[in-house]
Curated annotation (Swiss-Prot):
Domain BRCT residue range list: 309-398
Pfam family membership, one: BRCT_2
Organism whose genome encodes this protein: Caenorhabditis elegans
Name of protein: Pescadillo homolog
Similarity comment: family membership: Belongs to the pescadillo family.
Its job: Required for maturation of ribosomal RNAs and formation of the large ribosomal subunit.
CDD domains xref list: BRCT_pescadillo_like
Gene Ontology BP annotations: lipid storage; maturation of 5.8S rRNA from tricistronic rRNA transcript (SSU-rRNA, 5.8S rRNA, LSU-rRNA); maturation of LSU-rRNA from tricistronic rRNA transcript (SSU-rRNA, 5.8S rRNA, LSU-rRNA)
Top-rank taxon: Eukaryota
Length: 531
């Protein structure tokens, strides 16, 4: 009897969810401040399963949040800082109108500032959870580091992005944890293995960017603000783990005044010089196997071998970069492999005519070539890292058409189109490609040709043909028929619940096969036109 007279919309989705308008009213915040708060705290909207019930009978489109999330936000101390800042702006406008310079200066000195340190610790209770969220943080900070400063993009924020991203790249170099890289239209993709976690990020290409006017940066700025605080914590912990000074230093003893100079900062953040390590910390020789525990012995041994080959790939090699080459990207990869890098006016004081240079990286044809060094195009450095070894330089010489640059982030599956060059690359890396080769779909030209049967002309009039003995079917034919019948029987046994999934899988397989055939035909046609 009690449930019979229960009031409507007092349980279920109607209570579990709250609309954005209700949330703004509860928190007494503007939409702009509410968005900032949600981004900083990691709260995002949810789509209710029963939208009409959550909306209390209405069918209007609304943005919904969990009620427990809004109650959680109501106790956040940073809300008071948002309100203090509104009061500060009101006072600022008042004093500007009165032109009271002394009071205005004093007000600027007491400007309300909030710290995100507590929120970072709250959102990432363990260091591993922070590393797992590094992909977006690094990609966004690297993008902002390339942008010019505007009214929204403050100069201090862009400088912080440049500083923190350079510090992270220095850590990757010193720990030699870079594993893969790929050049794309969007930028250069990198993948590093830090404490057993794979971190992948993209860095835009080095080029001058104009002021971007068609993008609303107000939301992105809040993300960057949080990521700057997070990267500061992560970089400090990573530097402590391998015994580096933080902030990074080149020498053992550096004065504070010297560290603030632009010349010193240029040397530190150019990535060309190694960082100084603390004497009180003893670094283990090889910590790589510790990060790979829990895997089978073969995979573990393979990963250890790959990591070792990457660390010593460019050992003893001295690279000189021409001015047209992307210096940061090449320095990052070469120093990760144990090489030495220099360029004109660089911090390593390496001259172009030095006899110590073993590799000269150029992207333009050169008139004068030295005999005692190898000349390569920038792609050679990227391909060497992905191949885990120094590749032959003949195909990468200046003016030569470069080989295809394959992505190491895609995994080859049986039945996909895999170019011949990629198969050769996998074979050279010691991988078994026989299954991949066998599963590549064949075009009509590659199928075995059957001899055309010439039918004898029927003689006119009544004719009785001489009886002939038919040959027995081959074993392969019987096997094919039996396999086809077995497959049909198994398909009939699939339940109705899973039939749709099975048919969609079959359609996807056929589509992928057709796409692979089309790509193979295109590659064949391209080779024919080149020849």
């Amino acid at each position: 009897m009690k449930d019979r007279f229960k009031q409507k919309y007092t349980a279920g989705a109607a209570v579990a969810y709250m609309s954005r308008k209700q949330a703004l009213k509860k928190l007494q915040l503007t939409l702009k401040d509410f968005r900032r708060l949600c981004i900083i705290k990691g709260i995002y909207p949810h789509e209710p399963a029963h939208k009409k019930q959550a909306n209390k009978g209405s069918t209007a489109n609304k943005v919904f949040y969990y009620r427990k999330d809004i109650n959680f936000l109501a106790h956040e101390p940073i809300i008071n800082k948002f309100r203090d800042y509104k009061v500060f702006l009101r006072k600022l406008n008042h004093l500007k109108a009165k032109k009271e310079e002394d009071k205005l200066k004093k007000l600027y000195e007491n400007k309300p500032v909030y710290s995100l340190d507590t929120i970072v610790k709250e959102r990432f209770p363990t260091f591993g959870s922070a590393l797992r969220d590094m992909d977006d943080a690094l990609s966004l900070c690297f993008t902002f580091a390339m942008l010019p400063h505007t009214r929204v993009l403050k100069e201090g924020m862009i400088d912080s992005c440049r500083k923190l991203t350079a510090e992270f790249m220095h850590y990757v170099i010193e720990s030699q944890s870079l594993r893969n890289t790929f050049i794309s239209i969007k930028g250069i993709y990198y993948q590093a293995e830090v404490h057993g976690e794979k971190i992948t990020w993209v860095v835009p290409h080095e080029r001058g960017l104009p002021h971007v006017t068609d993008v609303d940066f107000t939301v992105l700025v809040t993300f960057v603000e949080f990521y700057i605080a997070m990267l500061g914590f992560v970089n400090f912990k990573l530097y402590q783990d391998i015994g580096l000074f933080y902030p990074p230093q080149i020498g053992q003893v550096v004065k504070t005044d010297e560290m603030e100079t632009e010349e010193y900062k240029e040397k530190v953040y150019s990535l060309a010089k190694p960082l100084a390590k603390r004497k009180d910390v003893e670094q283990a020789e090889d910590d790589e196997p510790l990060d790979l525990l829990g895997e089978d012995s073969d995979a573990l041994a393979q990963k250890v071998r790959e990591a070792k080959s990457i660390k010593t790939m460019f050992k003893g090699c001295v690279f000189y970069l021409n001015r047209e080459c992307p210096k940061e990207a090449l320095t990052f990869i070469i120093r990760n492999g144990g090489g030495i890098v220099g360029w004109e006016g660089g911090p390593t004081d390496l001259k172009a005519d030095s006899k110590n240079i073993s590799h000269h990286v150029v992207d333009r044809p050169m008139d004068k070539l030295e005999v005692n060094r190898l000349y390569v195009q920038p792609q050679w450095v990227f391909d060497c890292l992905n191949a885990r070894r120094k590749l032959p330089t003949e195909r990468y010489m200046p003016g030569v058409a470069l080989p295809p640059h394959f992505s190491p982030f895609t995994s080859e599956k049986a039945g996909d189109y895999i170019p011949f060059e990629r198969l050769e690359e996998l074979r050279s890396m010691g991988k078994d490609v026989s299954d991949l080769e066998a599963a590549i779909p064949k075009t009509m030209d590659e199928l075995p040709m059957r001899r055309k049967e010439v039918k004898p002309e029927k003689p006119k009039g009544i004719h009785i043909a001489v009886g002939q003995m038919h040959k027995k079917s081959k074993e392969k034919f019987h096997e094919t028929v039996e396999k086809g019948q077995e497959l049909k029987m198994r398909e009939l046994m699939i339940s109705k619940k899973h039939q749709r999934v099975y048919h969609s899988m079959k359609t996807t397989f056929k589509r992928n096969r057709n796409d692979a055939l089309k790509l193979k035909k295109k590659a064949k046609l391209a080779k024919a036109t080149e020849a």
